[in-house]
């Protein structure tokens, strides 16, 4: 339905309890764009100025197939961000970065892009967590799972979905040990399987 004439014709049938409109309703989302600002009217950004979403990625289908060395070699485990946002943070392509908010911290390889909208971040969905607990006060996921950045709050405009596409975060260049390429790290093995002799 893209015009009032069509909406009027559909509404004459009386099939819907609410009238259909030729335009979408707008819901202010939980942790949406407005929440990236400390002061919306003055347009002053807050502590977590970047809005992240979690697209599917060529390397895997959720966590399935993410254990294959060939695809790990072909496709890194990036975080896509706007090139200007990266430059303002001193981040270059290939840098290990920490993505964080009040819920957790995880590491990824930065991939700045000119085509990303400023203030947005793409964190491809579906990696396996690899926790670094060497600092109990600052546990970080070296696997790079986006779930570290969410408390599981459901979307208020589509209640069947967790809010993984409304993550408010900040990204900084990581000053710790750089990430090892996934293909060099070795596969994740099921419990009880010995890594010795595993290709």
Model-based region annotation:
Residues 63-65, 69-80, 84-199:
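Long, contiguous, secondary-structure-rich segments that constitute the structural scaffold
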Residues 1-69:
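Long, low-complexity segments enriched in small/aliphatic residues
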């Amino acid at each position: 339905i893209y015009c009032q004439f069509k909406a009027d014709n559909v509404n004459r049938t009386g099939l819907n309890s609410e009238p259909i409109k030729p335009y979408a309703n707008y819901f202010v989302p939980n942790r949406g764009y407005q929440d990236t600002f400390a002061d919306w009217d003055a347009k002053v950004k807050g502590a977590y100025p970047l809005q992240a979403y979690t697209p599917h990625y060529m390397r895997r289908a959720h966590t399935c197939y993410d254990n294959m060395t060939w695809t790990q070699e072909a496709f890194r485990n990036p975080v896509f961000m706007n090139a200007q946002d990266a430059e303002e943070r001193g981040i270059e392509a290939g840098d290990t970065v920490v993505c964080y908010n009040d819920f957790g911290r995880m590491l990824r390889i930065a991939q700045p892009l000119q085509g990303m909208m400023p203030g947005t971040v793409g964190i491809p969905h579906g990696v396996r967590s690899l926790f670094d607990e060497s600092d109990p006060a600052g546990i970080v996921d070296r696997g790079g799972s986006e779930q570290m950045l969410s408390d599981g709050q459901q979307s208020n405009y589509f209640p069947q979905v967790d809010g993984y596409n409304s993550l408010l975060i900040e990204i900084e260049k990581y000053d710790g040990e750089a990430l090892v390429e996934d293909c060099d790290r070795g596969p994740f093995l099921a419990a009880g399987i010995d890594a010795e002799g595993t290709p």
